[in-house]
């Protein structure tokens, strides 16, 4: 038999298999990030991978709608795979309106986007994120940013920058320049500022109807600045927004280092449901954003009919793993038990039971390898101790133990071994 052709032996394009070292690295990320969220009082949720297409498309921009994995089920219903967790969580809240607010939820789960696969961009990928629902206070914005930075710190991200913007600020600026009618065109062009050249971004705005002079001015205004500088600029544009950001600045100063933050008007995010503050993080030399989020005060009302302020963030787990250099985590076996014949098998099983109940991982040889082959095998898979039980050991009532790290060998009585639990 020839088996499967090569292309069927691989996962579908844009998806990946997780072998043990990579999966344990993923588990490490899950445990570390979950611990951060739990420490801030967030509780974990999960939703179906499959959603009604109408739910997914209700507030997503056209670019995102085009990336939804869409299909009809056998009953002819229009369904799709979730592209993030914010929309499904908004749906969940819509029929759980009696939940006490603010609601603090977090997730670590798979999402799907039918995007063009490339470096750092998969069609199936993991996201970690939080949603804080039911608060319009700037303290909520400060809390979400604090969780965001603490999550990045916890996994070892270094030299990262969190770039903040506010769609209301950009809207005020466009109003001043008389180009509010071209808001969507300008947003989409600014969103590509990190990927395209100055000329290409300006061209996108001009092709959308913005005059060349105004497009150049918008591009130049959308330069990075410190949070302190941004507060002054925002206050001149709108005193109400200025008051909000003065409070946010005060709360952030009390919780985190402001050196980690920059204000950048080109950060407008790719999803159309954000209504206020938006932000993205860039770690070291890694070119792509490892995560981001913002405020979406109108989204919950679309699903529940109830006005409910909310904000949150999502981190692309694979991107963050790549940015911090976490490629794999080896998880060596604690004990491998080798026996020379079936007479020793009951002893091997008894010892294995005791060790497993004490929390150790134990494999008992299946009887298909000789001792030389076992050595080759356990060195490849990674093993701490080899336990050998042969005829001599049975007669003496002991096991022979080889410490493969220290390269030591010693004997231990059966009775003493059982006493480990």
UniProtKB/Swiss-Prot annotation:
CDD domains: HisRS-like_core (cd00773). InterPro entries: aa-tRNA-synth_II (IPR006195), aa-tRNA-synth_II/BPL/LPL (IPR045864), Anticodon-bd (IPR004154), Anticodon-bd_dom_sf (IPR036621), His-tRNA-ligase (IPR015807), HisRS-like_core (IPR041715), HisRS/HisZ (IPR004516), HisZ (IPR004517). GO terms for molecular function: ATP binding; histidine-tRNA ligase activity. It is found in: Cytoplasm. PROSITE patterns: AA_TRNA_LIGASE_II. Keywords: Aminoacyl-tRNA synthetase, ATP-binding, Cytoplasm, Ligase, Nucleotide-binding, Protein biosynthesis. Pfam families: HGTP_anticodon, tRNA-synt_His. It catalyses: tRNA(His) + L-histidine + ATP = L-histidyl-tRNA(His) + AMP + diphosphate + H(+). Transmembrane segments: none annotated. SUPFAM superfamilies: Class II aaRS ABD-related (SSF52954), Class II aaRS and biotin synthetases (SSF55681). Its EC number is 6.1.1.21. One of its GO terms (cellular component) is cytoplasm. One of its GO terms (biological process) is L-histidine biosynthetic process. It comes from the Archaea. Its main location: cytoplasm. PANTHER family: HISTIDINE--TRNA LIGASE, MITOCHONDRIAL-RELATED (PTHR43707:SF1), HISTIDYL-TRNA SYNTHETASE (PTHR43707). Belongs to the class-II aminoacyl-tRNA synthetase family. This is Histidine--tRNA ligase. It comes from Pyrobaculum islandicum (strain DSM 4184 / JCM 9189 / GEO3). The lineage of its organism: Archaea, Thermoproteota, Thermoprotei, Thermoproteales, Thermoproteaceae.
């Amino acid at each position: 038999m020839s088996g499967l052709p090569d292309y069927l032996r691989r996962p579908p394009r844009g998806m990946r298999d997780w072998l043990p070292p990579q999966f344990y690295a993923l588990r490490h990320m899950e445990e570390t990030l979950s611990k951060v969220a739990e420490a801030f009082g967030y509780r974990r949720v999960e939703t179906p991978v499959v959603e009604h297409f109408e739910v997914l498309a209700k507030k997503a921009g056209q670019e995102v709608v085009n990336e939804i994995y869409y299909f009809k089920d056998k009953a002819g219903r229009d369904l799709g795979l979730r592209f993030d967790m914010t929309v499904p969580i908004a749906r969940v809240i819509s029929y759980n309106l009696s939940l006490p607010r603010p609601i603090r939820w977090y997730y670590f789960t798979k999402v799907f986007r039918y995007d063009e696969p490339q470096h750092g961009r998969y069609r199936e990928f993991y996201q970690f994120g939080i949603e804080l629902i039911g608060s319009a206070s700037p303290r909520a914005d400060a809390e979400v940013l604090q969780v965001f930075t603490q999550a990045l710190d916890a996994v070892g991200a270094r030299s990262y920058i969190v770039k903040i913007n506010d769609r209301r600020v950009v809207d005020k600026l466009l109003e001043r320049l008389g180009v509010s009618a071209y808001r969507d065109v300008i947003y989409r062009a600014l969103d590509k500022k990190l990927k395209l050249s100055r000329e290409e971004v300006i061209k996108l705005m001009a092709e959308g109807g913005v005059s060349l002079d105004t497009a150049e001015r918008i591009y130049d205004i959308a330069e990075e600045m410190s949070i302190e500088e941004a507060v002054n600029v925002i206050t001149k544009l709108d005193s109400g927004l200025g008051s909000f950001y003065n409070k946010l600045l005060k709360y952030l100063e009390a919780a985190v280092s402001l050196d980690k933050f920059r204000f950048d008007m080109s950060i407008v995010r790719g999803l159309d449901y954000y209504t206020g503050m938006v932000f993205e993080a860039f770690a070291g030399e890694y070119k792509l954003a490892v995560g981001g989020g913002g405020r979406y005060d109108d989204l919950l009302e679309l699903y529940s009919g109830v006005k409910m302020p909310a904000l949150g963030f999502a981190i692309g787990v694979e991107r963050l793993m790549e940015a911090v250099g976490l490629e794999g985590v080896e998880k060596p076996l604690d004990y491998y038990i080798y026996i020379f014949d079936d007479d020793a098998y009951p002893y091997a099983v008894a010892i294995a039971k005791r060790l497993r109940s004490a929390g150790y991982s134990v494999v008992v040889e299946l009887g298909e390898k000789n001792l030389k082959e076992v050595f080759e095998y356990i060195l490849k898979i990674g093993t701490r101790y080899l336990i050998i039980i042969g005829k001599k050991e049975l007669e003496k009532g002991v096991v022979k133990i080889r410490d493969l790290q220290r390269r030591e060998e010693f004997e231990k009585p059966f009775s003493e071994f059982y006493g480990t639990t």
